[in-house]
């Protein structure tokens, strides 16, 4: 019995740490975009469909906004699966547009880091935020709402 309780706590803590790690990485990238200049116009033609049809300025602001907003949702564990899925789409577009042709090596701007981010985001998509989250609290407050199982 004690082992099961400790396992639940460990799982909650590890998912919390994972959420904080991903939030930091994506928020930092969002801040770089916030403080930098839009370079998406230079690579717009490399974006996959349908993102290549969207103007570079809009893509820039959507990417920046996603990298600034979704990390906060991850930290608090609110709409975690949706946030992780959205960030997975974002990093997949980045992988396809920037990193895919550069090989695996991080030093060559390769796809190693995007791959790590996708794998860790998949954990949150499949497992959710864990016990130490507002998603879990919301499910406890509203146990009869069947749609909350997707949180």
From Swiss-Prot:
Main location: membrane
Record InterPro entries: DoxX, DoxX-like_oxidoreductase
Subcellular locations according to the entry: Cell membrane
Highest taxon, organism lineage: Bacteria
Annotated GO CC locations: plasma membrane
Alphabetically ordered keywords of this record: Cell membrane, Membrane, Transmembrane, Transmembrane helix
Transmembrane residue ranges: 8-28, 60-80, 82-102, 113-133
Membrane topology, record value: Multi-pass membrane protein
S-S bridge residues: none
Family: Belongs to the DoxX family.
Record protein name field: Uncharacterized protein HI_1602
Organism per entry: Haemophilus influenzae (strain ATCC 51907 / DSM 11121 / KW20 / Rd)
